[in-house]
Amino acid sequence: MKIAAYEVRRDEQKDFAFIAEKLGVELTEAEDNLTLENIDTVNGAEGVTTLGRTRLDRALLTAVQERGVKYISTRTIGADHIDLTAAKELGLKVCNSNYAPNGVADYTVMLILLSLRKYKPALWRAQVNDYSLAGLQGRELRNLTVGIPALDHQSGKV
């Protein structure tokens, strides 16, 4: 089986090589997004994997399907960059990554608290020995209403 990987980061390359060898898969890698302009790079591949920058709309999905691709994998939690209706109509199988819900929830809460407490500007100041408090008055989470806009297993942990 041949898989074409796009948006490949340097930190992924070693793992890709290990898995490809272990499974006996031919793997082509590209740092670029998959586009209609470079669509011929999927020729001969049964599967395509991307991150979230590639917009797999109906036109791009049709083009990969016409070149023999049967499987689309996104290395992201969400799949909102993929036209899932078009993929289903074209007979393409789609999957996405599964991240530990608790880790994602912890990261989300951390970002919320960092934003509320204006941590980034405080950190910048501390790096130049400026410990003044002007403009750093944050807010407390207990005084705010927090909405969780999704209903998946990730957001349920937040």
What are the roles of these predicted feature ranges?
Residues K2-K93:
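An N-terminal-biased, well-structured beta-alpha scaffold segment characteristic
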Residues E7, R139-V158:
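Glycine-rich adenosine-cofactor-binding loop
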Residues R9-Q13, P101, A105, S155:
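A structural signal for well-ordered alpha-helical scaffolds and beta->alpha junctions
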Residues K14, S73-A86, K120-D130, L144-A150:
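Short secondary-structure transition/capping segments
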Residues L90, C95-T145:
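Phosphate-binding beta-alpha-beta segment of Rossmann-like dinucleotide-binding domains, i.e.
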